[in-house]
Amino acid sequence: MEALKEKILKEGKVREGNILKVDCFLNHQMDIKFLNEVGKEFRKRFEGEKVDKILTIEASGIAIAGIASQYFDYVPVVFAKKTESLNLDKDVYESNVHSFTKKKDYKVRVGKQFLNKGERVLIIDDFLAQGCATKGMIDLVEQAGAELVGIGIVIEKGFQDGRKVLEDLGVRVESLAIIDKLEDNKVYFK
């Protein structure tokens, strides 16, 4: 998606440790008009696919998935929670995940009533790096007996193993921008 690449080049900041900071439009402050274009692009990438639900992970994926939902006939969006909560039923699907950016392990959970056998689920998230969060969401889909349509990623760090990990599982991955490298405070795309 050329408009996304341009926005990353113009507004993104490269940080030490292969971190790309896009908090000015994607995962802190959100450019809603632009995210609408992201949602339309996901619809285009998954044209002809029946989608019953969109699954993401809190927190950065929620807005993206919610906006994308309107282009998939307003299907429900389910987000995996990273923390236990009194308002989350005990009857949950649960998976272990490692966060690349936070450098910690945690469990993600989805109430069993929100992912059902036979549903066609599209996973959408902001970043793909090592693929750990996405693998955790795939595990939740499998536990539910639902069918995975594919993975929609806004920004993929193509120099890390996430895509290979997911494709080795036989999963379709659609990334809107793929970064080849982050070097000398610059972003290079594939």
From Swiss-Prot:
Binding site for 5-phospho-alpha-D-ribose 1-diphosphate: A129, Q130, G131, C132, A133
Catalytic activities: XMP + diphosphate = xanthine + 5-phospho-alpha-D-ribose 1-diphosphate
Subcellular location: Cytoplasm
Gene3D superfamilies linked to this entry: 3.40.50.2020
Entry keyword Iron: no
Residues of the signal peptide: none
One example GO MF annotation: xanthine phosphoribosyltransferase activity
Stored Pfam families: Pribosyltran
Binding site for xanthine: L20, N27, K157
PANTHER family reported for this sequence: HYPOXANTHINE/GUANINE PHOSPHORIBOSYLTRANSFERASE, XANTHINE PHOSPHORIBOSYLTRANSFERASE
HAMAP family, per the entry: XPRTase (MF_01184)
Subunit structure: Homodimer.
Function: Converts the preformed base xanthine, a product of nucleic acid breakdown, to xanthosine 5'-monophosphate (XMP), so it can be reused for RNA or DNA synthesis.
Protein's UniProt name: Xanthine phosphoribosyltransferase 1
Organism for this UniProt entry: Clostridium perfringens (strain 13 / Type A)
Gene designation: xpt1
